[in-house]
Amino acid sequence: MYNVLDIERAGDWIGVCEGELDTLTLSKCVGIPCVGVPGANSWKKHYTRLLADFERVFIFADGDAPGREFANSLAKELPVTIIGFPDGEDVNSAYTKYGAEFIREKAGIVDV
């Protein structure tokens, strides 16, 4: 798991995404506390325990089959809200095209 220090700075909720660059984009550019994994298939069972106390976990799912499968598998383990992106898009491409406010609004997070 990447960027675990954001677990400490997060309040009642946290974001999870796939890829280090997307994680940093959410955390540093968009202002959403976030942890990430290197790829959709790299989630370890013990990561769930690190996030179990959050009221809500926002999964920022890449716009591809592995990204959607990753989000749906976490939804079976945690209280998640899945924030999906169109085919071929992810956090970083959306940030580059539309900006931070677009991502915050997509997630319904306005108090960052």
Give residue spans per PLM region:
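Charged, flexible boundary elements
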Residues: 1-5
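TOPRIM fold recognition
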Residues: 8-14, 21-112
